[in-house]
A protein has these predicted regions:
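A generic local secondary-structure boundary/capping motif
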Residues: 3-11, 21, 66, 90, ...
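Solvent-exposed alpha-helices and their adjacent loops that cap or buttress functional pockets
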Residues: 9-13, 43-45, 67-71, 94, ...
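Glycine-rich anion-binding loops of enzyme active sites
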Residues: 1-39, 161, 173
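Helix N-cap motif at beta-to-alpha junctions
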Residues: 136-143
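Beta-strand->loop->alpha-helix junctions that form or flank phosphate-binding loops
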Residues: 80-81, 99-108, 126-128, 146-173
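Active-site-proximal betaalpha loop/short-helix elements
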Residues: 53-129
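Acidic, Ser/Thr/Pro-rich beta/coil linker or hinge segments at domain junctions
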Residues: 152-201
Length: 201
């Protein structure tokens, strides 16, 4: 890595592929399991759901995949924190003055995170997901990145491409939604704290 330039958030270029690791809503789901377990039970989730969700907290480091993306030639990368993967994608597009075309159906989501999203009624796209890393990768670097991630045992998905048309367009089963604001209107974890009472309150 000596002499290699750091990979910034703003380097995505038209034609790059957008890759993400692990899944959406990781940390937010784990936090809800730790801090709102009684609410989770009341909403119909089971003990095994809560225990499984807590284990997601073990995945919050992105160092292994960040090393791989950096070594293999990614043009940009961004960890998914407050505001979820939607805010991450919007920031990457805005900073690079490009657009992103994303397929929601290609985004991995742990089954337990999906169960929590349904029970707590939150949008997994806007839920904090530390442990998830998003990167833009040129076509000619793609196979090397994928091979290295596979060898490291890191779950990944190719979720879309960088375009010259500005804005983030996400394809859902119901159609395509275009997002143009830099920041989504709300953070889902913060909304959960206003809607539900934590266990120690």
């Amino acid at each position: 890595m000596r002499g290699r330039k750091p990979v910034l958030t703003k380097g995505a270029r038209p034609g790059d592929h957008i890759l993400m690791t692990k899944g959406i809503a990781l940390e937010g789901t784990a936090i809800l399991a730790y801090d709102f377990s009684q609410t989770a039970m009341r909403l119909g989730l089971k003990d095994n759901d809560i225990n499984e969700a807590k284990k997601l907290m073990k995945q919050v480091s992105v160092i292994p995949e960040a090393m791989i993306f950096g070594q293999q030639g990614a043009t940009a990368m961004h960890d998914v924190t407050r505001g979820g993967i939607l805010e991450t994608l919007m920031e990457m597009a805005s900073l690079a003055d490009v657009g992103l075309e994303i397929d929601y159906g290609c985004m991995p989501q742990p089954k337990v995170a999906a169960r929590f999203a349904e029970a707590f009624d939150f949008d997994p796209l806007k839920m904090i997901s530390s442990g998830t890393l998003v990167a833009s990768v040129p076509e000619d670097k793609l196979m090397g990145v994928k091979r290295a991630l596979d060898q490291a045992g890191i779950v990944w998905a190719d979720i879309g491409k960088v375009t010259s048309e500005k804005g983030v367009r996400i394809k859902f089963d119901s159609g395509v939604t275009k997002y143009q604001e830099v920041h989504p209107e709300e953070d889902e974890l913060a909304r959960m704290w206003t809607r539900y009472t934590p266990d120690d309150a």
